A protein has these predicted regions:
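NAD(P)-dependent Rossmann-like dehydrogenase/reductase catalytic/cofactor-binding core
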Residues: 231, 239-333
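Rossmann-like NAD(P)(H) cofactor-binding subdomain of soluble oxidoreductases
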Residues: 54-154
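NAD(P)+-binding Rossmann beta1-loop-alpha1 motif at the extreme N-terminus of oxidoreductases
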Residues: 1-51
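Nucleotide donor/acceptor-binding cores
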Residues: 1, 72, 165
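Residue-level detector of anion-binding/catalytic polar loops
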Residues: 2, 25, 197, 259, ...
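Internal alpha-helical scaffold of NAD(P)-dependent oxidoreductase catalytic cores
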Residues: 93, 134-211, 217, 223-261
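Short, hinge-like loop/turn segments at secondary-structure boundaries
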Residues: 44-47, 117-120, 159-163, 216-217, ...
Length: 333
């Protein structure tokens, strides 16, 4: 397949490397020193898991998506706040049969497209400030994706795959008689051939929330404390903040028809397995990058307000982490 990965950073880099290794025609959209390194030397993956090895794959790396033309699959590995500006150019990669797969954190902009409830078509302004993203690409091309993997870019052109290989993919159109379409099975098979653990979801929005409630609580707390996951899960004082945020997230999900089927303490037990891992917002603050507060936290507060679900602890923590980001020069006031 002809594959383009838009944003070949941490997760995008893992996807690009493994799909290229599996024989697909892969190109990447990147910027700056990272793009220069990939274009000149190839993309290097340092695997900290099964292989315990380092390898390099040559691939085309460009800054402008419009130079590549339509693809079979386009993965978006950007931070959520970077997507609105770039999406019009990403749209040039999408042909009539292209699968557009946003492998992103937080509430995705497509969440209420073809959602099939009274909320169908709702715009989440925390992730789509101008309310125009739904018109930039056809919703029929979008495949939902939830990533359960950890990676970091530690130097230009080099991605460290530090944990997990889980990629859940699913159709976003709830009117389909069978969500296991031929194209979704083809995509999952390609990911498996690339030695990733791909599963097909019959309800991708439930999978979005299953990950989101953890990110909603652990990410801002990690960013405020610089504590890794093991330390957070071992601190009853921090868990006294995490638990009510988990309860609030579960309540918002339920108000939109999603029942996760997991208690806060069960979700904390899942997080314990991450050990000394530094969660994404923690990494962003340490690297002095703009954090995904809007997509991961503010969007949930926005959705809570629309259905009158109180989220006082989430609001308080969001205010704290936002002010920390402003003070550090990562966000504007």
């Amino acid at each position: 397949m002809k594959v383009c990965v838009v944003g070949a950073g941490a997760i995008g880099g893992v996807l690009a490397f493994r799909l290229a290794t599996a024989g697909h025609d892969v190109s990447v959209i990147a910027r700056g020193a990272h793009r220069t390194a990939i274009a000149s030397r190839g993309l290097t993956l340092v695997d900290h898991q099964d292989d315990q090895r380092t390898a390099t794959q040559p691939m085309q790396a460009v800054e402008d998506p419009t130079s590549l033309g339509p693809q079979d699959v386009v993965f978006i590995g950007l931070k959520a706040h970077a997507i609105p500006e770039l999406l019009p150019r990403v749209a040039t990669l999408v042909g009539p049969t292209t699968m557009l797969v946003p492998a992103i954190n937080g509430v995705p902009w497509w969440y209420f497209q073809r959602e099939g409830s009274v909320h169908d078509g709702l715009v989440v302004h925390s992730v789509d400030p101008a309310g125009t993203m739904h018109a930039m690409v056809a919703s029929s091309s979008i495949i939902g994706c939830v990533v359960h993997a950890a990676a970091e870019v530690r130097e230009p052109g080099v991605v460290h795959h530090t944990g997990g290989k889980g990629f859940i993919v699913g159709e976003i159109d709830r009117s389909l008689p069978d969500p296991r379409t031929a194209r979704i099975e083809r995509l999952a098979a390609a990911l498996r051939d690339a030695r990733l653990d791909a599963t097909v979801s019959s309800d991708i929005r439930k999978d979005v929330w299953s990950k989101l409630i953890g990110n909603l609580s652990f990410n801002p707390v990690a960013a405020l404390t610089y504590a890794h996951m093991g330390r957070i899960c071992g601190s009853e004082a921090l868990l006294d903040v995490i638990r009510p945020m988990l309860r609030e997230g579960l309540a918002v999900a339920s108000a939109y028809g999603i029942e996760i089927g997991m208690t806060p303490d069960q979700r904390i037990d899942v997080a314990r397995y991450l050990g000394a891992a530094r969660i994404s917002m923690h990494q962003d603050f340490e690297a002095h990058r703009k954090p995904e507060i809007d997509a991961i936290v503010t969007a949930v507060i926005e959705l809570a307000g629309r259905v009158d679900v109180p989220v006082p602890i989430t609001r308080m923590v969001e205010a704290l982490v936002r002010e920390r980001a402003i003070s550090d020069g990562l966000l504007s006031a």
